[in-house]
């Protein structure tokens, strides 16, 4: 029998984390009342924390790309997100996987943090580029969008630390094996 790259448990973990991230960030956005700074920071903090924990749990090349694909499909099908976000999300994930490989691979202890950092950075940069293309008639609007994304990125940077802390606690509890 042929051994598959991802086993069933890892695929379930990726799917559960993708769905959890979408549900929790949507609840935070709805409870926060829109684009206020606290909900932006908290939403990105939770997203990055869960992504770091996922990358510690499933340490294989392609896990982030698969997570990104499942997350984008959930967003498209269930939440009515635009289909135009799927290519940029996949491209961001693939570039991040390349960055992780260039910095030593997935088995390194710092690989999940590097992956989450680069994924957030690349995906937010890609989102800003798409936003600029959409509002090129009034380029002054992009400065407001940059401010909103920068506030959210603060939460992403904080999420790196909380993700490492949560992964360490889950490792001590025996939930994360490596």
Regions found by a protein language model. Name each.
Residues 1-8, 172-178:
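Short, Lys/Arg-enriched, disordered terminal segments
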Residues 2-62:
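Hydrophobic transmembrane alpha-helices
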Residues 11-16, 41-45, 61-69, 86-87, ...:
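Hydrophobic alpha-helical transmembrane segments
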Residues 18-26, 70-79, 116-126:
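Aromatic-anchored segments of alpha-helical transmembrane domains
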Residues 28-32, 36, 58, 62, ...:
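Membrane-interfacial segments
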Residues 39-98:
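Alpha-helical membrane segments and adjacent membrane-interface helices in multi-pass membrane proteins
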Residues 81-131:
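Membrane-proximal helix-loop-helix units in multi-pass membrane proteins
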Residues 109-178:
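Membrane-embedded alpha-helical hairpins and interfacial helices in multi-pass inner-membrane proteins
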């Amino acid at each position: 029998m042929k051994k598959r790259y991802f086993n069933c448990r890892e695929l379930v973990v990726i799917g559960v984390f993708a769905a959890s991230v979408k549900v929790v960030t949507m609840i935070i956005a709805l409870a926060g009342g829109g684009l206020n700074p606290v909900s932006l920071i908290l939403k990105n903090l939770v997203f990055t924390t869960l992504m770091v924990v996922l990358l510690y749990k499933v340490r294989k090349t392609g896990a982030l790309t698969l997570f990104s694909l499942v997350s984008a499909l959930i967003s498209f099908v269930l939440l009515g997100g635009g289909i135009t976000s799927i290519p940029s999300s996949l491209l961001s994930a693939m570039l991040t996987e390349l960055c992780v490989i260039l910095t030593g691979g997935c088995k390194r202890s710092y690989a999940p943090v590097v992956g989450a950092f680069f994924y957030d950075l690349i995906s937010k940069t890609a989102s800003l580029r798409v936003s600029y293309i959409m509002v090129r008639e009034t380029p002054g609007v992009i400065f407001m969008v940059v401010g909103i994304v920068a506030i959210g990125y603060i939460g992403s940077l904080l999420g790196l630390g909380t993700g490492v802390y949560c992964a360490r606690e889950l490792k001590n509890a025996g939930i994360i094996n490596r």
